[in-house]
Curated annotation (Swiss-Prot):
Keyword Transmembrane applies: no
Region Disordered, residue ranges: 578-607
The organism of origin for this protein: Lactococcus lactis subsp. cremoris (strain SK11)
Name listed for the protein in its UniProt record: Chaperone protein DnaK
Regulation: induction: By stress conditions e.g. heat shock.
Family: Belongs to the heat shock protein 70 family.
Alphabetized CDD domains for the sequence: ASKHA_NBD_HSP70_DnaK-like (cd10234)
Amino acid sequence: MSKIIGIDLGTTNSAVAVLEGTESKIIPNPEGNRTTPSVVAFKNGEIIVGDAAKRQAVTNPETIISIKSKMGTSEKVSANGKEYTPQEISAMILQNLKATAESYLGEKVEKAVITVPAYFNDAQRQATKDAGKIAGLEVERIVNEPTAAALAYGLDKTDKDEKILVFDLGGGTFDVSILELGDGVFDVLATAGNNKLGGDDFDQKIIDWMVAEFKKENGIDLGQDKMALQRLKDAAEKAKKDLSGVTTTQISLPFITAGAAGPLHLEMALTRAKFDELTHDLVEATRQPVRQALSDAGLSTSDIDEVLLVGGSTRIPAVVELVRHETNKEPNKSVNPDEVVAMGAAIQGGVITGDVKDVVLLDVTPLSLGIETMGGVFTKLIDRNTTIPTSKSQVFSTAADNQPAVDIHVLQGERPMAADNKTLGRFQLTDIPAAPRGIPQIEVTFDIDKNGIVSVKAKDLGTQKEQTIVIKSNSGLSDEEIDKMMKDAEANADADAKRKEEVDTRNEADALVFQTEKTLKDLEGKVEEAEVKKAEDAKEELKKALEGEDIDDIKAKSEALSEIAQNLAVKLYEQANAAQGEAGEATDAQEGPKDANTFDGDFEESK
């Protein structure tokens, strides 16, 4: 069975891992980095992903960041003269990670386990699955990020019984999960979180502070300047990282804008104390989900054996301090917060292929599921933190006499009224025979699969007529749309490969021209004029081809020059050998022959 890669599709950074033997390994990207920025840019019709896209973000307005925060919504982003869904942009990141894995493994990769925040709803999970499909990946499993982290942490500890709390604060989302580990079973007891809280929010607090301070000093609002804002974002992210290790950092942005008197520079010092003050409300927002998860799991802090920190934002000292305070535990530092999720996803891939034995993953649904009933009430069928996959049925009836149809309004959330929860979908069960209210028996069944994706069935027990839907949110893509996007993605991949081949061909041709010129200089006056002219002509032909766009012509001219250059190189080599031989003979001749009766010796002059 071919390898199933593990992918952590993050808000700010992503990572890809693979199981080698029994060990999960992070695959470095072509730049040698173990994580890849979740950044996509468009330039001259070319799609740029990762480190290269992030590097040019300041000067390129066609750069898209933090697309994960839009997953599961109908919001689109405009770039490159067209509109893209969040799934399409995410697919470009996934394609990049897929190519990295293929280059490392030396084989095609078609299957993946992709992680999502535990608190992702059905629409966001479905969007992630669609993104994988567009990227040409069969998504074998969607795994919650804290669960994947626990899997990576606990794989070599399957003989121990432990309860662990995973605190996962990433670039755009926050989750807390509590798991029980024992005998190879990873059982999620509870999960809580916030899909709108992460490192990006901490960056924004610094940006807002810099904008306000600069306006106070110079009367200019940098918030209105797109290019300045991108520089501020980069500086804020760097300052935040610096303050995890030092207590003060200098922010220096020369020529940030211009005033009436000329260019203006931004120079500010940010202390950790000020940063803590600016972000106090964000850190505090992580407290309640920790308590909620413990309460839902029916545990107290003394029951927790280990606390794992996951996500780059858990390096913030104030966050670490809050976790210490809430759990009365020193967080476990044995896992890399940026890499552990992808490693866990790769382990789950190994469980699916059978390479990892005796490991069972029991995940939960993060939010309650149910339907709207009379009076706009939300009636739950499946409570949050129910182990998945699961199925639950309940019988309802009509609200009016002779009601011919019932509307099934499917919801996800925790609020008592339907209007306050997230709508997953609506459908109708029709042709109900005329009967007084309360008589027809309508059975509603919820199914949640191992990926946390929901399907709902309504059945009239009297007529046995039923209607089923797999939930598709407003942002959900039809199969036709996904197929079209897959074809576009494949075309982009082919175009990228072709563009790379063209660049490589041009680079090789340039190098060949340079090498030929060097060889001709070395051979000056040592070979026949006709041979030199032949090489000169071929070289000029190639230089001329390089000025054009015909890659096949460049290849043909390169091959012709390469053959001539090789012959010249052979001649140069032969001449060098011949010269060496002559030099050796000349030395022997100078020393002259020695007579058999002649001896070498030292002598002194006697006085």
